[in-house]
């Protein structure tokens, strides 16, 4: 196809698009424009984080002008799709912007429609920067993709335009006069919806649609995303792509715009928007993606705090057992596994044996038609229920899936197993399905947690990846090896693959996930020849067992040479995957159904597992119990722990049940416990375990004589000491217990002694479990790793039978304040990890009585309560009655499903209080005193006038 040069040539220069470039030809038409602040003041009215930014709507307007120049001024409307913003164009006030637009015709689509590829770039000196790419067409309309938002009516609750623009300015984006065009803004509190009126104030005769008006429509998406409330706007959002957009060339007058936002993955949001004029004629309709952009300066300033985070110690944790597949009848993945089996069996029922993926499943279950199929323990019941029974089961399972987040994958699985054609959806639909599928592949959520525990134990790991170099495998691991604040938990990451081309994946990953070093690996060569260092790697990840070569035994020997004594080998192919997931992955990635479904090459994988076992690796849990856990994590078999045959157990003069249980557990492992007290002469050469803090912390009321004896004991001991004390860091009932922690840190540093502290609570965990954990810690003391970058662990805590260790991690001021506010609740609710506080949730089946709460601060708090679950609220004050000042606010809460009961009375009058409680429509779960006076004043001078206001 060629561009109509004659129509394009007859148009004069246009401000935004510019003049036709001399190098234009029939296959590529191009324009050049130069914009400046004097002639285009609107361009300088959008400032993002202190820098002027070219609005996304400007690219849409340029695309529309291209179509107008190809239509001989007869353009009714134009369409764009797949418009992607590659980079932001930022500039200074005095800059002149040079834009280059290129238009190339594409082949006619299946409906004989002509689309053009458009590229917009900026040029500064001799350097060109790509800004935007996409497709544009004149008078091409796909009614199936246009959202009809106007038929639902406007949203109900008003938002002040001044409040909105001031609020986003505080977040980092300032709109000038021409850009502040949203009026009569209203939002919906139950959905992410917003409406607004646009009053055009600029001359639009020079373009199809002025970019300012288009930008106003896009602005509304951010209003809808946070329901017009500043406290819900954590970060600014910007448009990063436009899936489709139709813009009319009708005269623009007063417009009403509606926007609906649906949350997506990775914090991306999808926004549908439309605009109509006063006569109800559609002017603009489309869909875009908006993405939060963090204020990096604000984030870096916020990371001024750190906290001690306690997590499970991977040394004492069965990493394999946690990867066993979850098989509940209510689990969506189990339902999809059953559906895949039933679809395959139904293909036989209806004579569709040629269906390739169903044929593959039938081959997998064999001719006997019994036994396990993925997450289905036995296929016999599904085989024996007959065609009609299978049809009924399919209906039931489809209904179960339809209401879950996996419903779209269920539809794709049905097409995969019932149709004989390849995937026919768009590339965008394919990518959305793959994005949803990817977190489920190889049980990545649980796998990431296991990897994170390893990295938490040793945040300075040296990681070696051996495999095909697939980017998705590398990204899965790299994502797990980072903290919540995006700090990497490894020292080095070496990705070795069999070919040079495969190393490009890790290179791309390194841009966003950390420093990854690529390497070409040959299993037939020695490790020294390839620059690998023996005994240097803490974690070796095998993404493809074929990377170890044809000789599994030789590959296992190489792994044994490469791994550190305390390191782990991860066989990624050993992670269990549902069969439906493997089939659907092949279907979406266009792999042949006759090829491998992605399941492991059984003999090869088993050969590697067996070879690792023969070379001294073990897969079982620390207690050597036989389990059904998958063989994923392997480590070198640890030598028998070097423990003494006797240990001194120092306890109080009274009987402590925990000590008796410790004696029994240690005795079962041939370790004799010799009981003693702090007043006895304790042999200096024997290991010591101390239990003297459980009545009263030993050092809290220590005398001078006792301190002298204590120092003599610690300074003279030649063995190891474990000091067992009540919990003080994870949760604490008596802060005096923490005194021993600081003292032991000092003595460990001053006297260079091996002193370990263990925190526990015998009232929360059974003594049998505690004694077993203490034995594990004691046996592990001699195996603690130590390097120049990482000290061994000397502090442990036992929580619900799980051994935890602390690490210092960064946090923000906001997270720290939230944590401090939740500490009081944590003291009553039991052990909690000192991590970011969980989201507050109010009980929907209970009622909350608010005393006051109808002022500005009280309304904010009550609205927040409703957003977080509260569904029954009584407002109790002398002014709590329906009226022009209160009813609109009450209706806002009612629109969110909350029953609001205002009650007029005084909290100082007991009969009023009793009557107010009788109004409750559900059991009262809380009474909140919300009366307050929002004034800053020094109460020492004259508090009486203010106290009167508070009491009211």
Swiss-Prot record:
It comes from the Eukaryota. Residues 446-621 are annotated as: Methyltransferase (MeT) domain. Pathway: Secondary metabolite biosynthesis. Residues 847-938 are annotated as: Ketoreductase (KR) domain. GO terms for molecular function: fatty acid synthase activity; methyltransferase activity; oxidoreductase activity. Residues 15-284 are annotated as: Dehydratase (DH) domain. Residues 1-25 are annotated as: Disordered. Keywords: Methyltransferase, Multifunctional enzyme, Oxidoreductase, Transferase. Disruption phenotype: Impairs the production of terrein. SMART domains: PKS_DH (SM00826). Residues 14-143 are annotated as: N-terminal hotdog fold. Induction: Expression is induced by methionine. Nitrogen starvation induces expression of terB and promotes terrein production during fruit infection, via regulation by areA and atfA. Iron limitation acts as a third independent signal for terrein cluster induction via the iron response regulator hapX. Finally, expression is under the control of the terrein cluster-specific transcription factor terR. Residues 156-302 are annotated as: C-terminal hotdog fold. Transmembrane segments: none annotated. 6-hydroxymellein synthase; part of the gene cluster that mediates the biosynthesis of terrein, a fungal metabolite with ecological, antimicrobial, antiproliferative, and antioxidative activities. The first step in the pathway is performed by the polyketide synthase terA that produces 4-hydroxy-6-methylpyranon (4-HMP), orsellinic acid (OA), and 2,3-dehydro-6-hydroxymellein (2,3-dehydro-6-HM) by condensing acetyl-CoA with two, three, or four malonyl-CoA units, respectively. 4-HMP and OA are not pathway intermediates, but are rather shunt or side products. This is 6-hydroxymellein synthase terB. The gene is terB.
């Amino acid at each position: 196809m060629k561009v109509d040069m004659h129509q394009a040539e007859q148009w004069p220069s246009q401000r935004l698009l510019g003049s036709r470039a001399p190098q234009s030809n029939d296959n590529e038409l191009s324009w050049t424009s130069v914009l400046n602040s004097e002639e285009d003041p609107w361009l300088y009215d959008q400032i993002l984080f202190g820098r002027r930014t070219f609005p996304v709507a400007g690219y849409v307007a340029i695309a529309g002008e291209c179509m107008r120049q190809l239509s001989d001024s007869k353009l009714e409307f134009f369409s764009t799709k797949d418009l992607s913003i590659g980079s932001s164009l930022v500039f200074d006030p005095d800059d002149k912007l040079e834009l280059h637009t290129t238009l190339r015709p594409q082949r006619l689509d299946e409906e004989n429609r002509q689309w053009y590829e458009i590229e917009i770039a900026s040029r500064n000196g001799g350097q060109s920067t790509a800004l935007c790419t996409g497709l544009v067409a004149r008078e091409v309309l796909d009614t199936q993709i246009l959202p009809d938002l106007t038929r639902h009516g406007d949203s109900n609750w008003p938002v002040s335009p001044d409040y909105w623009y001031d609020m986003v300015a505080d977040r980092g984006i300032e709109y000038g006069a021409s850009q502040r065009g949203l009026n009569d803004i209203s939002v919906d509190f139950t959905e992410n919806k917003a409406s607004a009126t646009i009053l055009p104030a600029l001359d639009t005769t020079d373009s199809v649609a002025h970019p300012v008006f288009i930008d106003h429509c896009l602005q509304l998406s951010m209003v809808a995303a946070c329901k017009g409330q500043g406290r819900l706007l954590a970060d600014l959002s910007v448009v990063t792509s436009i899936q489709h957009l139709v813009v009319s060339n009708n005269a623009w007058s007063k417009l009403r715009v509606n926007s609906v936002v649906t949350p997506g993955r990775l914090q991306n949001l999808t926004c549908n928007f439309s605009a109509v004029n006063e006569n109800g004629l559609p002017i603009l309709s489309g869909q875009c993606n908006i993405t939060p952009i963090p204020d990096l300066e604000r984030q870096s300033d916020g990371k001024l705090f750190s906290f001690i985070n306690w997590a499970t110690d991977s040394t004492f944790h069965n990493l394999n057992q946690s990867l066993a597949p979850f098989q509940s009848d209510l689990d969506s993945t189990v339902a999809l596994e059953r559906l895949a089996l039933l679809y395959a069996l139904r293909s036989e029922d209806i004579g569709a044996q040629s269906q390739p993926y169903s044929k593959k499943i039938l081959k997998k279950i064999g001719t006997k038609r019994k036994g396990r199929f993925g997450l289905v323990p036995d296929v016999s019941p599904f085989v024996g229920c007959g065609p009609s029974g299978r049809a009924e089961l399919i209906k039931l399972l489809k209904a179960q899936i339809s209401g879950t987040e996996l419903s779209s994958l269920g539809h794709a699985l049905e097409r995969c197993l019932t149709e004989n054609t390849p995937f026919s959806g768009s590339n965008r639909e394919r990518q959305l399905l793959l994005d949803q599928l990817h977190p489920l592949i190889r049980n990545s959520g649980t796998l990431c947690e296991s990897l994170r525990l390893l990295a938490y134990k040793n945040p300075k790991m040296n990681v070696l990846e051996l495999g095909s170099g697939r980017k998705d495998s590398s990204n899965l691991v790299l994502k797990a090896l980072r903290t919540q604040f995006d700090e990497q938990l490894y020292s080095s990451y070496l990705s070795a693959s069999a070919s040079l081309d495969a190393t490009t994946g890790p290179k791309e990953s390194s841009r966003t996930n950390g420093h990854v070093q690529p390497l070409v690996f040959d299993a037939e060569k020695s490790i020294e020849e390839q620059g690998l260092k023996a005994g240097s790697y803490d974690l070796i990840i095998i993404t493809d067992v074929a990377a170890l070569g044809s000789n599994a035994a030789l590959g296992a020997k190489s792994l044994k040479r490469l791994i550190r004594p305390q390191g782990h080998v991860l066989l990624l192919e050993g992670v269990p995957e549902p069969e439906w997931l493997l089939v659907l992955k092949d279907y979406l990635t266009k792999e042949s159904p006759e090829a491998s479904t992605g399941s492991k090459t059984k003999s090869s994988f088993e050969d590697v597992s067996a070879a690792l076992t023969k070379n001294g690796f073990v897969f079982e849990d620390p207690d050597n119990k036989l389990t059904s856990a998958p063989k994923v994590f392997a480590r070198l078999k640890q030598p028998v722990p070097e423990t003494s045959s006797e240990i001194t157990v120092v306890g109080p003069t009274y009987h402590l049940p925990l000590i008796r249980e410790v004696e029994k557990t240690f005795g079962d492992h041939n370790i004799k416990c010799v009981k003693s007290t702090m007043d006895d002469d304790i042999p200096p050469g024997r290991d010591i375990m101390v239990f003297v803090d459980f009545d009263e912390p030993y050092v809290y009321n220590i005398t001078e004589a006792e301190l002298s004896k204590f120092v003599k004991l610690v300074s003279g001991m030649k063995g190891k000491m474990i000091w067992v004390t009540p919990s003080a860091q994870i949760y604490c009932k008596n802060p005096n217990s923490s005194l021993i922690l600081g003292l032991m840190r000092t003595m460990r540093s001053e006297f260079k002694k091996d002193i370990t502290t263990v925190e526990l609570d015998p009232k929360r965990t059974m003594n049998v479990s505690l004694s077993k954990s203490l034995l594990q810690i004691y046996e592990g003391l001699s195996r603690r790793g130590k390097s120049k970058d990482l000290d061994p662990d000397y502090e442990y805590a036992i929580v619900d039978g799980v051994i935890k260790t602390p690490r210092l991690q960064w946090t923000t001021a906001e997270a720290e304040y939230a944590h401090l506010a939740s500490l009081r609740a944590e003291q009553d609710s039991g052990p909690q990890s000192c991590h970011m506080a969980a989201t507050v949730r109010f009980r929907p089946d209970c009622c909350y009585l608010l005393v006051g709460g109808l002022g500005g601060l009280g309304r904010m708090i009550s609205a927040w309560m409703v957003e977080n679950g509260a569904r029954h609220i009584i407002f109790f004050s002398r002014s709590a009655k329906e009226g022009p000042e209160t009813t609109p606010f009450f209706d806002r809460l009612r629109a969110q499903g909350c029953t609001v009961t205002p009650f007029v009375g005084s909290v100082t009058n007991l009969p009023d209080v009793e009557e107010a409680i009788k109004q409750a429509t559900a059991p009262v779960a809380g009474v909140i005193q919300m009366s307050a006076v929002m004034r800053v004043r020094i109460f020492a001078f004259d508090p009486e006038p203010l106290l009167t206001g508070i009491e009211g």
